[in-house]
């Protein structure tokens, strides 16, 4: 039995890492033709079959050849467990992984992989024994045992991210949010760019009570700088950006209300309405509070946003329909407000029509799109 790793096997392993599986298989086939007793070559051949083709039977055949040469090779046993799962024999993996732990009781990976699969195996067995229903007590017992295995994996491999990932999944399945949050922090200490943990922590912070849209968008933009490929955080940034855009409709409606007040649009009992048309000075003065509203409510807020958030706002308008609808509604309401205040009307009928047209076209969808993310 070959004791050391042959250079050809090392090259094949690198090819597999690069997802060049066919080239790796060709290299391993030549190596096994030279030395059919190379255990590592058989193991890497199994790994290549699990890469692109997910061919469980071929991977299983390769691991069986490796184990026939050395039944105590833990690397071959671990790959054999993966091959069994790919071949549809998932329930058999428990015994294989327990053998891995027996042979290497001080190595973390066997504990972590068994913890990751054990609760699933027990759920399948419980379902098979109970007419397709997983009993709650069986699930709880499986999660407890899996949690103990995960903690042992962490103890043996305190710097191994996978052990913490498994422990997080088990805590999440058990509904233990406190432990899950603590494990997320541990994962991020080891890997500050871990996409899933970063996305979960960011979402928790962004959706906390009292966090407004601008703050949420900033949190997501900062997190995306560390993990730019994260789809959940990109979606979260889009959602927060859309919430920011929705706010401009309220600014436009406020300006519409100011326009109505400026022209005394609706008569009130005991109060004489202004004579129309309003003088030019008054009409120009009516623009001042509108300018203040947009300066304080939109322009200054926009300038304070992170560059990434500003870029995403523009991108969202190009990519999504509802943000464009929101912008169009705000523009329509503002157009109505300007028409009401800047044309020297001699009668209030048309301004009233403009007021209701600007108001109803916007208010009609505000409640409807509250839950939309753009």
Language model features by range: what are they?
Residues 2-4, 63, 74, 93, ...:
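Residue-identity detector for threonine
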Residues 238-374:
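Helical anchoring/docking segments at protein termini
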Residues 4-237:
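Alpha-helical protein-protein interaction scaffolds
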Residues 1-22, 304-322:
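N-terminal leader/linker segments that initiate helical-solenoid repeat arrays
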């Amino acid at each position: 039995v070959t004791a050391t790793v042959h250079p050809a096997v090392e090259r094949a392993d690198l090819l597999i890492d690069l997802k060049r599986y066919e080239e790796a298989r060709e290299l391993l086939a030549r190596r096994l033709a030279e030395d059919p007793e190379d255990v590592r070559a058989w193991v890497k051949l199994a790994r290549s079959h699990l890469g692109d083709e997910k061919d469980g039977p071929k991977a299983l055949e390769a691991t069986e050849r490796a184990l026939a040469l050395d039944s105590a090779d833990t690397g071959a046993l671990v790959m054999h467990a993966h091959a069994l799962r790919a071949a549809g024999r998932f329930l058999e993996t428990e015994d294989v992984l327990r053998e891995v732990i027996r042979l290497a009781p001080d190595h973390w990976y066997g504990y972590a992989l068994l913890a990751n699969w054990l609760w699933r195996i027990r759920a399948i067995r419980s379902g098979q024994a109970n007419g397709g229903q997983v009993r709650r007590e069986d699930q709880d017992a499986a999660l407890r045992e899996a949690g103990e295995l995960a903690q042992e994996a962490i103890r043996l491999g305190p710097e191994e991210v996978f052990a913490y990932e498994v422990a997080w999944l088990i805590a999440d399945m058990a509904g233990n949010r406190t432990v899950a949050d603590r494990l997320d922090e541990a994962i991020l200490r080891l890997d500050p760019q871990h996409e899933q943990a970063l996305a979960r922590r960011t979402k928790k912070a962004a959706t906390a009570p009292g966090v407004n849209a601008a703050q949420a968008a900033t949190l997501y933009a900062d997190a995306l700088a560390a993990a730019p490929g994260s789809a959940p955080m990109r979606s979260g940034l889009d959602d927060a950006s859309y919430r920011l855009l929705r706010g401009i409709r309220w600014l436009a409606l406020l300006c519409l209300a100011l326009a109505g007040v400026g022209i005394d649009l609706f008569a009130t009992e005991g109060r004489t309405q202004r004579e129309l048309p309003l003088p030019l000075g008054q009409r120009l003065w009516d623009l001042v509070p509108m300018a203040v509203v947009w300066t304080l409510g939109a322009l200054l807020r926009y300038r304070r946003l992170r560059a990434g958030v500003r870029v995403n706002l523009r991108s969202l308008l190009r990519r999504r329909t509802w943000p464009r609808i929101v912008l169009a509604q705000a523009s329509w309401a503002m157009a109505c407000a300007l028409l009401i205040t800047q044309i020297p009307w001699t009668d209030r009928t048309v301004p009233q029509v403009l007021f209701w047209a600007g108001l109803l076209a916007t208010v009609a969808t505000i409640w409807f799109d509250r839950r939309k993310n753009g």
